Structures are given as structure tokens and as C-alpha cells.
Amino acid sequence: MMDQSIADAFPEVQVLEHEPLSKYTNTQTGGPADLLVFPESVTETKRLVLWAKETDTPLTIIGNASNLIVRDGGIRGLTLILTKMDDIQVNGNEVVAEAGAALIQTTEVAYQAGLTGLEFAAGIPGSIGGAVFMNAGAYDGEISEVVTSAEILTRDGEIKNLNNHELDFGYRHSSVQDYQDVVLSATFKLRSGDANKIRARMDELNRLRASKQPLEYPSCGSVFKRPTGYFTGKLIHEAGLQGFTVGGAQVSMKHAGFIINVGGATATDYMDVIHHVQATVLKQFGVTLETEVRIIGEEK
């Protein structure tokens, strides 16, 4: 039965109970969320965050669930998925996108406005919130290079506007991770450009992705961070791990840095593959592979 306090506090909000998160993650794995809500506005998100604090309910925030593994035991308390907060506005050379907006769609909006600077993100399957949270990047570009500010919501329900310096970006890191704040929106400072050149660069990067990455299978994208002085995929390839499989989770033959769902994988399968890859690379090369993918939830 639904937690009556959340039903009383939010009679107008659809609250899903014991909802399998495998329906929403890119890996198509993950256990249930006790309570799941898709907030549609900043106001609604703030009210839900404050409710969680006031009722001492564990709170988890999810974006597009593209670089995410949810363990098979699922997530206790309240989970918010922000994908319905997806407005994108263009103001001169600035693009302001809400946290749930897809990064791919944001790059398209920038292109249509004749703005250059976001081409590197073409094809990255995450949300704006997730991209800021982890300073997403590819092909020599990073979110930190184009974000001027982000509106965030603290776990105390306070809305702040953090500039680029305050976001303290690093390799796959931002201050949002340190304080577990909620990204509400981000502002990108771009430049006027030639629409044909912008489109050509986006198409080129999408072709590169398709040729190098196993896009035909469910996956969580790049699993490991790049260790200093090494290429992750090369290490995994040289360790002879491509094709290594546990259950339905497999180290991709196409790109060693990806773990794909070849059918019926569980999050436990994914974690077993990750741990085996880490142990093997450490033993063979003395290199520790840290996970880039966000791993949350409880063991089953």
C-alpha cells in the first residue's frame, strides 16, 4: 500500500509504487523503486525534496539513467526521475536547458539556432542534469567548457545559482556530486557559427560513435574512468577480456570500454563483470580502474 503521507501531501501527483527501474535504465536492468515520481516543474521538485527531508525519507535523483547501474535490490524511499523537466530556451548566444532535457536534443536546438560549441555532445545519451553532475565529455570537449552556470536545489530545499567556478568541474566530477544537490537547469554560452559546419561536425561524430560503440545493444555507456597515462579500452583489450560474459552482461567485442546487455542481464551480472575486469587489469598491469558509471541501490 502506498505511503499515505505522500499520497496526502501530493494528491495531484502520480506516485508509482515498487516500480521496476529496469524500465528506465539504459542497461535495462535494476530493481524496484519503493516510490517513484516524475516531477514536472521546479516547484513540484522542491516540494518533493522538502517532503523527503521532513519525513526522513531517503531520496534519490535520477536523470536519463544512461550512465547508471541500479542494483537488483532497488532503491528505498523516494526516487525522482527528472525527464519531464525538459524545456530548452535560446536567448541570443545562450541556451538554457532544464535538467531533464536530453543532451542530444539540446545539441539539436543549438544547431537549429546556428550556435556552435556543443557539437562534441552530439550522440551523448544523457540528460542535462546528469551531464552537469558528472561533467560529461567526448571527443575533446567537456560540459565544463560551455556551461556558465547551473541552477541547483539543495537537499534543504534552497535554490542556488552556481557559476562555472563554483561548480568546481574536474574529470567526470562537479561540486554537485560532493553535496548531492539537484541540478534544475544549466545555461550554456555558445557562439554564432555556420549551420552547415555545425551539422557536418555533429554528423561526423555520430558516425564515429556508430562505428566504434556497440549502440545496437543496451549499455550504460563508458563504464570506467580513463586512468592517467592509459586508455581504458586498450587495457581491457590487452587483458583479453573482450567477450567476457556473466549471465547477460558482456564486455563488448566492438569497444572494450563498454559492457552490454546481450539478453536478460541483471545488475548483479554487470557488477560481476565490472569487478572481474577491475581485478584482471590490476593483476596484469597494476592499474586501478575506477568506475565512471554511477552505481546506486541495494543488493538483492
From Swiss-Prot:
Gene Ontology annotations for the cellular component aspect, listed alphabetically: cytosol
Keyword Cytoplasm attributed: yes
A molecular function (GO) term: UDP-N-acetylmuramate dehydrogenase activity
Record field: catalytic activity: UDP-N-acetyl-alpha-D-muramate + NADP(+) = UDP-N-acetyl-3-O-(1-carboxyvinyl)-alpha-D-glucosamine + NADPH + H(+)
Cofactor needs: FAD
Compartments where located: Cytoplasm
Catalytic class of the enzyme: oxidoreductase
EC number: 1.3.1.98
The UniProt record lists the keyword Cell wall biogenesis/degradation: yes
A GO biological-process term: cell wall organization
Residues annotated as the enzyme's active site: 172, 222, 292
Pathway: Cell wall biogenesis; peptidoglycan biosynthesis
SUPFAM superfamilies given in the database record: FAD-binding/transporter-associated domain-like, Uridine diphospho-N-Acetylenolpyruvylglucosamine reductase, MurB, C-terminal domain
Entries under Gene3D superfamilies matching the protein: 3.30.465.10, UDP-N-acetylenolpyruvoylglucosamine reductase, C-terminal domain, Uridine Diphospho-n-acetylenolpyruvylglucosamine Reductase, domain 2
InterPro entries assigned: FAD-bd_PCMH, FAD-bd_PCMH-like_sf, FAD-bd_PCMH_sub1, FAD-bd_PCMH_sub2, MurB, MurB_C, MurB_C_sf, Oxid_FAD_bind_N
Main subcellular localisation: cytoplasm
PANTHER family, alphabetized: UDP-N-ACETYLENOLPYRUVOYLGLUCOSAMINE REDUCTASE (PTHR21071:SF4)
UniProt-listed NCBIfam families: murB (TIGR00179), PRK13905.1 (NF010480)
Function: Cell wall formation.
Listed name of the protein: UDP-N-acetylenolpyruvoylglucosamine reductase
